[in-house]
Amino acid sequence: GAHSVQATIAGKLWNNWVERFPVVYSDIFKDAMKNHDISLSYAMAISRQESALEANVQSPAGARGLMQLMPGTAKDTARKLTDINYQSAEQLFEPSVNIRLGTQFLEQVYQQFDKNRVLASAAYNAGPTRVKRWLDESQGKLDVAAFIESIPFTETRNYVKSVLVYDYIYKLIMNNKASGIQTESEFTRLY
């Protein structure tokens, strides 16, 4: 389960992929993502990076739960949904609520940035406004690797790299076709 991630880190079991990348809460993820374009592997990768798949974690900044949602983001996202009764930030520790709101927000930034996981992941971590600013600054002159390296926040830069690799690993674990770390459109786009 989710605690296995921490156990593999403590035990330095770096090659134990199934334990390091558990497929937990998959039914909740699948249910929450019924009308979304994001893949299960991508949503799991975000959750793995955000919380190591621990439901009851809170960041120093106040982000909560599996997908590490800020209460304000959760509230804004819940307003757009009719199938969730979001009343309190404490609900973000409930996997079903956190995953429903987290996958909705992830889908929102994924669509906003033309289904590009590099940009959507950066936006999920640092906010869409910052990503737009970084794109304005790069003026469409950078390939994907240069754009990722140009992200001014070390945390976000590393976050994007980790999420892309984790998505690839989850695709392999879940027996999906994994053709590469980046999609063709992510690789060929200028940023």
Language-model features and meaning:
Residues G1-Y191:
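Catalytic glycan-binding domains that act on GlcNAc-containing polysaccharides
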